[in-house]
Swiss-Prot record:
Component of the 30S ribosomal translation pre-initiation complex which assembles on the 30S ribosome in the order IF-2 and IF-3, IF-1 and N-formylmethionyl-tRNA(fMet); mRNA recruitment can occur at any time during PIC assembly. It comes from Burkholderia mallei (strain ATCC 23344). This is Translation initiation factor IF-1 2. It comes from the Bacteria. The keyword Protein biosynthesis applies.
Amino acid sequence: MAKDDVIQMQGEVIENLPNATFRVKLENGHVVLGHISGKMRMHYIRIFPGDKVTVELTPYDLSRARIVFRAK
Protein backbone atom coordinates (compact mmCIF):
# COMPACT_ATOMS: atom_id res chain seq x y z
CA MET A 1 0.00 0.00 0.00
CA ALA A 2 1.59 3.25 -1.15
CA LYS A 3 1.70 6.12 1.29
CA ASP A 4 2.62 8.73 -1.32
CA ASP A 5 -0.76 10.45 -1.28
CA VAL A 6 -0.96 11.23 2.46
CA ILE A 7 -1.25 14.76 3.84
CA GLN A 8 0.89 15.48 6.91
CA MET A 9 -0.29 18.16 9.34
CA GLN A 10 0.45 19.36 12.85
CA GLY A 11 -2.19 19.38 15.56
CA GLU A 12 -2.95 19.24 19.26
CA VAL A 13 -4.74 16.45 21.12
CA ILE A 14 -7.86 17.84 22.78
CA GLU A 15 -9.60 14.68 24.04
CA ASN A 16 -8.90 11.02 24.80
CA LEU A 17 -11.43 8.51 23.48
CA PRO A 18 -11.63 4.72 23.96
CA ASN A 19 -9.48 2.25 21.99
CA ALA A 20 -6.41 4.50 21.58
CA THR A 21 -8.42 7.08 19.66
CA PHE A 22 -8.08 10.83 20.11
CA ARG A 23 -9.79 14.01 19.00
CA VAL A 24 -7.12 16.21 17.38
CA LYS A 25 -7.45 19.90 16.50
CA LEU A 26 -5.35 20.69 13.43
CA GLU A 27 -3.48 23.95 12.79
CA ASN A 28 -6.15 25.06 10.33
CA GLY A 29 -8.87 24.70 12.98
CA HIS A 30 -10.47 21.44 11.81
CA VAL A 31 -11.10 18.71 14.38
CA VAL A 32 -10.41 15.12 13.27
CA LEU A 33 -10.53 11.68 14.84
CA GLY A 34 -7.02 10.24 15.18
CA HIS A 35 -5.73 6.79 16.05
CA ILE A 36 -2.19 5.79 17.01
CA SER A 37 0.00 4.27 14.31
CA GLY A 38 1.26 0.72 14.77
CA LYS A 39 4.86 1.64 15.59
CA MET A 40 3.77 4.09 18.30
CA ARG A 41 1.48 1.42 19.76
CA MET A 42 4.28 -1.16 19.63
CA HIS A 43 6.72 1.11 21.50
CA TYR A 44 4.13 2.13 24.16
CA ILE A 45 4.31 5.85 23.34
CA ARG A 46 1.74 7.58 25.53
CA ILE A 47 -0.35 10.51 24.31
CA PHE A 48 -2.20 12.92 26.60
CA PRO A 49 -4.49 15.90 25.95
CA GLY A 50 -2.41 18.98 25.16
CA ASP A 51 0.33 17.06 23.33
CA LYS A 52 1.46 18.37 19.96
CA VAL A 53 1.29 15.62 17.34
CA THR A 54 1.93 15.06 13.64
CA VAL A 55 -0.92 13.34 11.83
CA GLU A 56 -1.33 11.82 8.38
CA LEU A 57 -4.60 12.36 6.54
CA THR A 58 -5.69 10.47 3.46
CA PRO A 59 -7.39 12.44 0.68
CA TYR A 60 -10.25 9.92 0.70
CA ASP A 61 -11.50 10.68 4.25
CA LEU A 62 -10.40 13.99 5.75
CA SER A 63 -12.27 13.39 9.02
CA ARG A 64 -9.91 10.62 10.20
CA ALA A 65 -6.17 10.69 10.75
CA ARG A 66 -3.25 8.52 11.86
CA ILE A 67 -1.02 9.92 14.63
CA VAL A 68 2.58 9.25 13.59
CA PHE A 69 4.66 11.48 15.90
CA ARG A 70 4.35 13.11 19.33
CA ALA A 71 6.44 16.24 19.89
CA LYS A 72 8.38 16.47 23.14
